[in-house]
């Protein structure tokens, strides 16, 4: 029941083509491909900018001293 044979998928494909038509399916495929490409480009750009930030942060040092400011309040 959970697995479908190739004939089930071919019947579903024929029904989808009849309902939507090949032109509309082609446009959906192009839009989906463009979205995937845009996502990959965005991921690549964010990785590159992340490396730039790491290089900028890695060269700077900050000298600081921590102090304890815990106060006990008695009521």
Curated annotation (Swiss-Prot):
Subcellular location as annotated: Cell inner membrane
GO cellular component, one term: TAT protein transport complex
Gene Ontology biological-process annotations: protein transport by the Tat complex
Pfam families per UniProt: TatA_B_E (PF02416)
Keywords (A to Z) from UniProt: Cell inner membrane, Cell membrane, Membrane, Protein transport, Translocation, Transmembrane, Transmembrane helix, Transport
Classification via NCBIfam families: PRK02958.1, tatAE
Record protein name field: Sec-independent protein translocase protein TatA
UniProt organism field: Aromatoleum aromaticum (strain DSM 19018 / LMG 30748 / EbN1) (Azoarcus sp. (strain EbN1))
């Amino acid at each position: 029941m959970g697995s479908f044979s190739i004939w089930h998928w071919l019947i579903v494909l024929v029904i989808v083509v009849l309902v939507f038509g090949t032109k509309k399916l082609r446009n959906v495929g192009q839009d989906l491909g463009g979205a995937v490409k845009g996502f990959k480009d965005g991921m690549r750009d964010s990785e590159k900018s992340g490396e730039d930030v790491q290089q900028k942060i890695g060269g700077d040092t900050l000298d600081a001293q921590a102090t304890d400011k815990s106060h006990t309040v008695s009521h």
